[in-house]
């Protein structure tokens, strides 16, 4: 059992949420996560975002499609990769979410104990 939740597990949790909310493609997810966590001193590495997305595809949670970024194919050549749930991906995502919740609760317990024992906070 790990001491704290793994970074990739943490990122996968957020990526699943973003796909549920249809919040864009890989690079957009990266930028959104950076903006969301920057105030907390955490900038998720690009490599970890794409590894996490790749794992979710390999695990059958997500599949990807490609499309042109703009609306005019005569001038828009940049292709983006969009992520979607597979047929049983939402169920797999929910199971994954429950597993990560258990780990998060354990980690929070450890952190709260350390905070209480060393700083007197409860």
Residues of each region from the PLM?
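Short capping segments at the starts of secondary-structure elements
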Residues: 10, 18-28
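Beta-hairpin "wing" of winged helix-turn-helix
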Residues: 57-76, 84
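Short, leucine-enriched amphipathic alpha-helices that occur as contiguous helical runs
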Residues: 8-12, 46
């Amino acid at each position: 059992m790990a001491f704290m939740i793994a970074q990739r597990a943490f990122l996968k949790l957020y990526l699943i949420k973003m796909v549920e909310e249809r919040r864009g493609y890989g690079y957009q997810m990266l930028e959104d996560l950076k903006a969301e966590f920057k105030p907390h001193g955490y900038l998720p590495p690009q490599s970890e975002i794409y590894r996490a997305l790749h794992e979710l595809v390999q695990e059958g949670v997500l599949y990807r499609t490609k499309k042109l970024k703009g609306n005019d194919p005569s001038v828009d050549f940049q292709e983006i990769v969009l992520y979607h749930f597979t047929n049983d991906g939402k169920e797999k995502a929910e199971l994954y979410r429950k597993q990560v919740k258990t780990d998060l609760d354990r980690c929070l317990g450890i952190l709260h104990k350390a905070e209480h024992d060393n700083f007197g906070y409860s």
